[in-house]
Amino acid sequence: MSTHDCFSKEKPVDMNDISEKSSVVDNAPEKPAGANHIPEKSAREMTSSEWIAEYWKGIKRGNDVPCCCPRKMTSADKKFSVFGKGSLIRSIQKNN
């Protein structure tokens, strides 16, 4: 049986370093730079038509909503916005 101590290589935790890092997190701005506009209402409080309106505002800006990762609008998005938007809204309204 081996008596090797596998934890001997771990560095001790520096509590000062941890408090410095946590203060950076605590003082972070509420919205990161370049983040999409997030409506004041949460998704649970929004009606389906309000949510779709926010979604399409983001697509027209070239972003996915509610994701904060920028993405260029593709030709498929443009075609869907013309042909599919109405049927999508109608199908959601039927389900509500």
From Swiss-Prot:
Recorded superkingdom: Viruses
Q: What does this protein do?
A: Inhibits cGAS-STING-mediated type I IFN expression and NF-kB activation by inhibiting TBK1 and IKBKB/IKKB. Inhibits host TBK1 phosphorylation.
Q: Which residues form a coiled coil?
A: none
**Which family does the similarity line name?**
Belongs to the asfivirus DP96R family.
- Keyword Cell inner membrane assigned to the entry: answer is no
Q: InterPro entries this protein is in?
A: ASFV_DP96R (IPR003670)
Region annotated Disordered sits at 1-45
* Region of interest: Inhibition of host cGAS-STING-TBK1 signaling pathway: 30-96
Q: Which GO terms describe its biological process?
A: symbiont-mediated suppression of host cytoplasmic pattern recognition receptor signaling pathway via inhibition of TBK1 activity; symbiont-mediated suppression of host NF-kappaB cascade; symbiont-mediated suppression of host toll-like receptor signaling pathway
Q: Any idea what this protein is called?
A: TBK1 inhibitor DP96R
Q: Please list the residue ranges that the record marks as compositionally biased, kind Basic and acidic residues.
A: 1-20
Question: What Pfam families does this protein's entry cite?
Answer: UK
Q: Which UniProt keywords apply?
A: Host-virus interaction, Inhibition of host innate immune response by virus, Inhibition of host NF-kappa-B by virus, Inhibition of host TBK1 by virus, Inhibition of host TLR pathway by virus, Viral immunoevasion
